[in-house]
């Protein structure tokens, strides 16, 4: 590569790194289903909604005294299954398999002990930014 190719390569590398750092805007359910007092700060004072979403975080400035830019709820296989653990309503029995849970048209996540692993989905109609 000649001297003219080096600046082009530098630009491509910088753009590539920016794409790796920039987050993806979380789904509405991952943001709106998190109660304000459970928000974990993801930004800095004065952050804009655009900057916050670029970090892959949620933004909601409608509640005073809590972080406006905050980490979203964990991703799930279906938007209907995104909810706080405290919102889970049991749809199964202890030791239920993912397959048995799915046959009941319910959500399954066994990442947290002592909460329902098989739980009823929620409508996505209430999800918003």
Swiss-Prot record:
Biological-process GO terms, alphabetical: calcium-mediated signaling; cell population proliferation; chemokine-mediated signaling pathway; establishment of localization in cell; gastric acid secretion; macrophage activation; negative regulation of gastric acid secretion; negative regulation of inflammatory response
Q: Where is the signal peptide?
A: 1-23
- UniProt cross-references to PROSITE patterns, sorted A to Z: P_TREFOIL_1, P_TREFOIL_2
Keywords for this protein: Disulfide bond, Repeat, Secreted, Signal
Which Gene3D superfamilies has this protein been placed in? Answer: Spasmolytic Protein, domain 1
The cellular location(s) given in this protein's UniProt record come to:
Secreted
What is known about what this protein does? Inhibits gastrointestinal motility and gastric acid secretion. Could function as a structural component of gastric mucus, possibly by stabilizing glycoproteins in the mucus gel through interactions with carbohydrate side chains.
Q: Which PANTHER family match?
A: INTESTINAL TREFOIL FACTOR-RELATED (PTHR13826), TREFOIL FACTOR 2 (PTHR13826:SF17)
State what protein this is by name: Trefoil factor 2
């Amino acid at each position: 590569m000649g001297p003219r190719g080096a600046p082009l390569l530098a630009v491509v590398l910088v753009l590539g790194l920016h794409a790796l750092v920039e987050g993806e805007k979380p789904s509405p359910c991952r943001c709106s289903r998190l109660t304000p007092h459970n928000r974990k700060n993801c930004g800095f004072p004065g952050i804009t909604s655009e900057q916050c979403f670029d970090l892959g975080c949620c933004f909601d400035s409608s509640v005073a005294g809590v972080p406006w830019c905050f980490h979203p709820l964990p991703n799930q296989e279906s938007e209907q299954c995104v909810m706080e653990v405290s919102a889970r309503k049991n749809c199964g029995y202890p030791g239920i398999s993912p397959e048995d849970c799915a046959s009941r048209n319910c959500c399954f996540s066994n990442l947290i002990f002592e909460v329902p692993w098989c739980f009823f989905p929620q409508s996505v109609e209430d999800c918003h930014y």
